[in-house]
């Protein structure tokens, strides 16, 4: 499991045990199916998507499987919660339209203590589809300025990917490194702007910076991942194939990229059947 997933699962299990036992010693044999159901119901209200609720199920089932392997009699708890229906490709991926992209880009270059760092992180997401965790772990050694490439090492798929570095993205990163980045021995590209400056930023810092960029542009969005969808949509609109989009997004399977076919208006129009107006 990825570090972020492990942290999420640990937090869920910790909440379950605290709700049931408080400060008392944990006796998993004393936990009943109703305890798990009530906890699951309360946790489900915190998530707005089936995927979020599914993460609670995965955390609980993983913990009960672990306790079973340890010899605890918790077989009755394994089947208490089930995954919600989550139909793949059921919805359109949300993305910024061209006017919203222009508003976001025009809002960059603002004056502030971390302005250039924010600009560089937004450009990484918008131009390369870099995830928040990947931005946070980006190293100075990952950028080949002469070749115009960038290496993403700590990716979701746990492999190294080499991507071309667009001029606008490279310029934004270079401006941050030359004009704003604190003097530090850290090899991380993006570091804290306040003490301790030797520490790299975390994914939450990237998410917060993108949310603030949305707000400055007057856009009603909060999710940083929206910029990754936007990049895929722009590639399709520019004539790129799904295979090319999959390569840039670094998807292992082309099936993962198929959802973006719904945004390919150019090719969809070519295969659309005439509307039977006489029937309507």
Describe the role of every protein-language-model region:
Residues 1-280:
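Conserved catalytic core of the tyrosine transesterase superfamily
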